[in-house]
Amino acid sequence: MRAFRALLFVSIVVSASNSASAGNGPKGGPSFMEYEWTEIVATDFSTTERWEPRAGLQAVELHNELFVIAGRTPSPTQDNPFASIIHGDVWVSSDLGETWVELLDDAESAGLWKNRAYFEAVTKGGYIYIIGGQNFTTFIPAPPFVRPSEFFKDVWRSKDGVDWEQMTDDAEWAKLPKKTVPTDPPCGPPVTQGRAGLSAVSFKGKLWVLGGSQGDDLSINAGPDCRQVFNDVWYSRDGSEWHLATDDAPWEARAGGVALVKGGWLYFLGGEKGFTGEDDYFNDVWRTKDGMTWEEVTGPEGAGWSPRPGHKCSVVANHFVCMGGFAALDPFPPNFDTNPSDIWISKDGANWEKVSDSPWNNDPSYSDCIFATPPELPIICDHVRYDFDMLTVSGGKGGMKPSIFTFGGDREIFVPIPGNEFRIENDVWRYSPRE
């Protein structure tokens, strides 16, 4: 989760490129050498029949339908380099992402939840739950071109994506701890006590919330670093009342981690505690059976994949599968770090194998950015995306084998160039065994 860092600045089937031997699949199942990418629908800025290109969205499956919810779209403007369109819409697809129907145009205008991005959506017991997130709001005395974020502490649920019920407007996990590091000038009180970049999952009949952040980072705040990250764990039966499992998990406080369930364990993978240094990103993997007692399954060097936020992981064919993410620690020329172009798998979260260097059929040799002349022309590069969403889906037409679907995402870079706002997606891809 990128926490609104400053923005300075069909169907095609092709086999995924493999840079390492892709481990054998489960007994009787495919190996990842046999997986390929299918573009279900391509990015289209002109369409009105699908959700707009966006990042920080959420996608879930409920009753054999796919739902896409909210998120942010960068908006070109000369006055406000941070301007974004914040969505509160809900879309549904009954044909595995090929066509979409809008169920809700704008939740906030309808008197429901405020439009948001970098929140969590989880399904449990026939409901879609949305939890936390953030928005941009005008806030004085901030400069007129900076709009600090509002962080949300509410929980809503719906059976159909149309009618929503508020479970709480002040979740217990929103109790903000005091900041212990002094700043100059000092940090003022937060606009709200909610959090974004939190991780949520349904596990053992409960909703779980892990970590997250509150407050904008320096690139937005332009003042003291008032952003706080958390390492607490909470659970709830229905999102209305939350109970503390631990206020100090052994993993370092962070936002943008991935929470997954596999083999009776809740796993937590990667994330970030900031965007200014190499040590701000994580590639560790932890697991728990009760939310209180945790064990680290990776060694001192972490997982095989590089530390990153903005990534996504899912479970398919009895493996964790992780891809994407944000890795640009030095986003300016001549160094210009690029995002990781790789796919990694693991059965146990401890031992990882790289099975591809071309997620979404990306050409890894085309990842370095070339600056055009004159400088007002767009740059040429093919950054791998971050802040997309991903889930495992099975069934549908023809009894599809369990497959990974991805939705949208961000490829913006932190250089003031024309067209940067168009480096964002509303495509849908499937990563599945070759038929």
Regions found by a protein language model. Name each.
Residues M1-L7:
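Bacterial N-terminal signal peptides that target proteins for export
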Residues L7-A16:
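Bacterial N-terminal signal peptides
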Residues N18-S21:
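Sec/Tat signal peptide C-region and signal peptidase I cleavage site
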Residues G23-E435:
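Kelch-like beta-propeller repeat domains
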